[in-house]
From Swiss-Prot:
NCBIfam families: Obg_CgtA, PRK12297.1, PRK12299.1. It comes from Cronobacter sakazakii (strain ATCC BAA-894). SUPFAM superfamilies: Obg GTP-binding protein N-terminal domain, P-loop containing nucleoside triphosphate hydrolases. Residues 129-143 have a biased composition (Polar residues). It comes from the Bacteria. One of its GO terms (molecular function) is magnesium ion binding. The keyword Nucleus does not apply. This is GTPase Obg. Transmembrane segments: none annotated. The lineage of its organism: Bacteria, Pseudomonadati, Pseudomonadota, Gammaproteobacteria, Enterobacterales.
Length: 390
């Protein structure tokens, strides 16, 4: 299946149903009064995270989602039926962005998590709601309000504990093949990896972590060189980054300069990502003698001003790989994920306390009082009234 990590969709919530103007017509009840019902609320549009999905490719073909409109009110005080909601399933790890405002509406990080992205319109009011002591036969009603409409940008960001960084041919895919059951393509030319891949590293029956491999970065990636930096977003949720450095580059380039390029591209992309814990891992030590590999690694670390611990491994022969994985496992255990509080969904507002409807009622009642003619009122504060009859 083709890997698609970005998609744009249109979501439209249902409009609210209109109120009804109706009067009770029944035998022996000549003045039955108003009995027009309210309309139904429009349906909402929801997103739901599904762990069984791993790509957004479905939304390259189906781009528009519309919830059902609320039914209009009917006579005999019948309220219109509420419009049906629409639920759109997305992979776990999807970020939802409103294209109109650029606002991030939410991150779908848990299976079954739901996020409302378009609220249905409010129902209109029937003429029964406008009955009062001065208006016994109201002919007023209100229309339902339109549902929300949004263009959404969906961005899939892989959920991994460890992210792999490095130049093309640094050995990232070989490392994942060595520590997990994932089998990304491996070859001796640059950009063998074209899409991100995940691997689960199982240390024992109870301990495991997920590692993400992304295509290699080159100088100028922030400006779009190579495969650009579009895949760096998949590392934003990682807790630690493994920066693989090829001790013996096939093109004869300087490993220290290559490392500086990677750090520079990280900083251009995101300061938050650049500030994540980053471990230096020198790969392909099997191509050099032990003394030569250690000396070269120390020289590179000194050139980078690196004062923390670094690792020397060979992903191809799995030399020192197990020790590195255990250190990663201990780091993950000591630094658990801090989940952000999920965005609270607005509670459903009941009719009597709805500001929109209350305002409409007040306006209609004010108009009715202004138009009221009290010539037939027995209680007259202004004196005697004469009524002429033919």
């Amino acid at each position: 299946m083709k890997f698609v990590d970005e998609a744009t969709i249109l979501v439209v919530a249902g409009d609210g149903g209109n109120g009804c103007v109706s009067f009770r017509r029944e035998k022996y009840i000549p003045k039955g009064g108003p009995d027009g019902g309210d309309g139904g609320d429009g349906g909402d549009v929801w997103l739901e995270a599904d762990e069984n999905l791993n790509t957004l490719i479905d939304y390259r073909f189906e781009k528009s989602f519309r919830a059902e409109r609320g039914q209009n009110g009917q006579s005999r005080d019948c309220t219109g039926k509420r419009g049906k909601d629409v639920t759109i399933k997305v992979p776990v790890g999807t970020r939802v962005i409103d294209q109109g405002t650029g606002e991030t509406m939410g991150d779908m990080t848990k299976h079954g998590q739901r996020l409302m992205v378009a609220k249905g319109g409010w129902h209109g009011l029937g003429n029964t709601r406008f009955k009062s002591s001065v208006n016994r036969t109201p002919r007023q009603k209100t229309m339902g309000t339109p549902g929300e409409k949004r263009d959404l940008q969906l961005e899939l960001m892989l959920l991994a504990d460890v992210g792999m960084l490095g130049m093309p041919n640094a050995g990232k895919s070989t490392f994942i093949r060595a520590v997990s059951a994932a089998k990304p393509k491996v070859a001796d030319y640059p950009f063998t990896t074209l899409v991100p891949s995940l691997g689960v590293v199982r240390m024992d029956n109870e301990k495991s972590f997920v590692v993400a491999d992304i295509p290699g970065l080159i100088e100028g990636a922030a400006e779009g060189a190579g495969l650009g930096i579009r895949f760096l977003k998949h590392l934003e949720r990682c807790r630690v980054l493994l920066h693989l450095i090829d001790l013996d580059p096939i093109d004869g380039s300087d490993p220290a300069e290559n490392a500086r390029i990677i750090v520079g591209e990280l900083e251009k992309y995101s300061e938050k990502l650049a500030s994540k814990p980053r471990w230096l891992v020198f790969n392909k030590i099997d191509l050099l003698s032990r003394e030569e590999a250690e000396a070269k690694a120390k020289a590179i670390a000194d050139a980078l001003g690196w004062e923390e611990k670094y690792y020397l491994i060979s992903a191809a022969s799995q030399m020192n790989v197990k020790d590195l994985c255990w250190d990663v496992m201990h780091f993950i255990i000591e630094n658990p994920v801090v989940h952000e509080e999920e965005a609270k969904q607005p509670e459903k507002v009941e009719f009597m306390w709805d500001d929109y409807h209350r305002q409409q009622l007040e306006e209609m009642e004010a108009e009715a009082e202004e138009e009221w003619d009290d010539d037939w009122d027995e209680d007259d504060d202004e004196g005697v009234e004469i009524v002429y009859q033919r």
